[in-house]
Amino acid sequence: MAASRYRRFLKLCEEWPVDETKRGRDLGAYLRQRVAQAFREGENTQVAEPEACDEMYESLARLHSNYYKHKYPRPRETSFSGLSLEEYKLILSTDTLDEFKEMNKGTWKKLQEKFAPGSPEGKHTAWARALPRPRT
């Protein structure tokens, strides 16, 4: 029975899309990682709690098949902000979020990052390079 559970999870992982714009935050990538951890021995893995495993699979399968989207249809395909799906994907991409973090940094934090290298020895040389040399 563990072999059929493993195959069902593998099939679900194959069908679940991976969004490359959400590096490190994508549900599809996380799902693949968790299945690999849970079924380390592949089809020979012994499942400690088969009922919980089956419930988890059924929940993920409902999400993947858009069960709730069809059960609770929306009258319009807009959000409260009026943005489209593509605009949300752009805003929530990892690159855009990194840009927002950079924009929200204060001047002091930007200066610290610019002049403070990782090692303590490097701090002195970075400040020495940043200070103007006296004219002789």
Curated annotation (Swiss-Prot):
Transit peptide: 1-13
Keyword Membrane carried by entry: yes
Compartmental location: Mitochondrion matrix, Mitochondrion nucleoid; Mitochondrion; Mitochondrion intermembrane space; Mitochondrion matrix
Xref: InterPro entries: UQCC2
Chain positions covered by the region annotation Disordered: 114-136
Segments forming a coiled coil: none
Pfam families the record matches: UQCC2_CBP6
Keywords attached to this entry: Membrane, Mitochondrion, Mitochondrion inner membrane, Mitochondrion nucleoid, Transit peptide
A biological-process GO annotation: regulation of insulin secretion
Cellular component per GO, a single term: nuclear body
Protein's job: Required for the assembly of the ubiquinol-cytochrome c reductase complex (mitochondrial respiratory chain complex III or cytochrome b-c1 complex). Plays a role in the modulation of respiratory chain activities such as oxygen consumption and ATP production and via its modulation of the respiratory chain activity can regulate skeletal muscle differentiation and insulin secretion by pancreatic beta-cells. Involved in cytochrome b translation and/or stability.
Subunit-level organization: Interacts with UQCC1. Forms a complex, named COMB/coordinator of mitochondrial CYTB biogenesis, composed of UQCC1, UQCC2, UQCC4, UQCC5 and UQCC6; stabilizes nascent cytochrome b/MT-CYB and promotes its membrane insertion. Forms a complex, named COMB/coordinator of mitochondrial CYTB biogenesis, composed of UQCC1, UQCC2, UQCC4, UQCC5 and UQCC6; stabilizes nascent cytochrome b/MT-CYB and promotes its membrane insertion. Forms a complex, named COMA, composed of UQCC1, UQCC2 and UQCC4; activates MT-CYB translation.
UniProt protein name: Ubiquinol-cytochrome c reductase complex assembly factor 2
Annotated source species: Bos taurus
Gene name of the record: UQCC2
